[in-house]
């Protein structure tokens, strides 16, 4: 799996203005839009089916740095597999443009997901994969696609898990852009 960034005008969903696969270049473009994008490395090998404590321990230094920088209060690990009985419902839940009252911070331990951000007339499609951290600032319009056969393990950081409720914008813009196949 790879990571990539595609940038569009929100008025021209079929025309890619910028397409990047170099992670340093992706980080620069995203930073200019106020989005944190980093790569993390585990400080120890993970087992084949790691539990939450093992995953957090493997990335503890980066987690601690982010907590110190941003004041996050809660850390957990979420995973999704293709045979999850509610995968379709979970996918549908975040496919429409929405906002959260706090940052949405995700680090991909395994797998991938497509975050699409709608900022100042631009749409940023960020395909995140293993080793990628993305932090979507509070109140940024965005949507997320885990794909029809999702497979990922991600670390989540929160200020307040109750603040991570999706507030939908009512826009249909997400339907005009790419989804994971």
Curated annotation (Swiss-Prot):
Q: Site described as May play a role in transmitting local conformational changes, positions?
A: 103
Query: So which cofactors does this thing need?
Result: Fe(2+); Ni(2+)
Write down the Gene3D superfamilies for this protein, in alphabetical order. Answer: Jelly Rolls
Report the catalytic activity. Answer: 1,2-dihydroxy-5-(methylsulfanyl)pent-1-en-3-one + O2 = 3-(methylsulfanyl)propanoate + CO + formate + 2 H(+); 1,2-dihydroxy-5-(methylsulfanyl)pent-1-en-3-one + O2 = 4-methylsulfanyl-2-oxobutanoate + formate + 2 H(+)
A Pfam family hit: ARD
Sorted alphabetically, the keyword list is: Amino-acid biosynthesis, Dioxygenase, Iron, Metal-binding, Methionine biosynthesis, Nickel, Oxidoreductase
Q: Does the record carry Metal-binding as a key word?
A: yes
- Record EC number: 1.13.11.54, 1.13.11.53
| GO BP annotations, alphabetical order | L-methionine salvage from methylthioadenosine; L-methionine salvage from S-adenosylmethionine
Query: Could you name the domain of life of the organism this protein comes from?
Result: Bacteria
Q: Does the keyword Iron apply?
A: yes
Q: Where, in this chain's numbering, is Ni(2+) bound? A: 98, 100, 104, 142
Pathway annotation: Amino-acid biosynthesis; L-methionine biosynthesis via salvage pathway; L-methionine from S-methyl-5-thio-alpha-D-ribose 1-phosphate: step 5/6
Q: What does this protein do?
A: Catalyzes 2 different reactions between oxygen and the acireductone 1,2-dihydroxy-3-keto-5-methylthiopentene (DHK-MTPene) depending upon the metal bound in the active site. Fe-containing acireductone dioxygenase (Fe-ARD) produces formate and 2-keto-4-methylthiobutyrate (KMTB), the alpha-ketoacid precursor of methionine in the methionine recycle pathway. Ni-containing acireductone dioxygenase (Ni-ARD) produces methylthiopropionate, carbon monoxide and formate, and does not lie on the methionine recycle pathway.
Which PANTHER family does UniProt cross-reference here?
A: ACIREDUCTONE DIOXYGENASE
**Similarity comment: family membership:** Belongs to the acireductone dioxygenase (ARD) family.
What is the name listed in the Swiss-Prot or TrEMBL entry for this protein? Acireductone dioxygenase
Q: Which organism is it from?
A: Alcanivorax borkumensis (strain ATCC 700651 / DSM 11573 / NCIMB 13689 / SK2)
The UniProt gene name for this protein comes to: mtnD
């Amino acid at each position: 799996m790879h990571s990539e960034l595609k940038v569009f005008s929100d008025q021209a969903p079929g025309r890619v203005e910028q397409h990047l696969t170099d992670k340093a270049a992706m980080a620069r473009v995203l930073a200019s839009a106020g989005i944190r994008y980093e790569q993390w490395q585990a400080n120890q090998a993970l087992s084949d089916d790691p539990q939450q404590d093992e995953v957090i321990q493997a990335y503890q230094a980066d987690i601690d740095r982010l907590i110190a920088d941003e004041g996050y209060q809660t850390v957990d690990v979420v995973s999704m597999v293709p045979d999850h009985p509610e995968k379709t419902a979970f996918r549908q839940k975040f496919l429409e443009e929405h906002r959260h009252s706090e940052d949405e911070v995700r680090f991909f331990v395994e797998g991938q997901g497509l975050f699409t951000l709608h900022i100042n007339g631009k749409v940023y499609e960020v395909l995140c994969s293993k080793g990628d951290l993305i932090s979507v600032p509070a109140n940024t319009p965005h949507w997320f696609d885990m794909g029809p056969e999702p497979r990922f393990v991600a670390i989540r950081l929160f200020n307040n898990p109750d603040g991570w409720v999706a507030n939908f914008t009512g826009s249909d813009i997400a339907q005009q852009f790419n989804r994971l196949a």
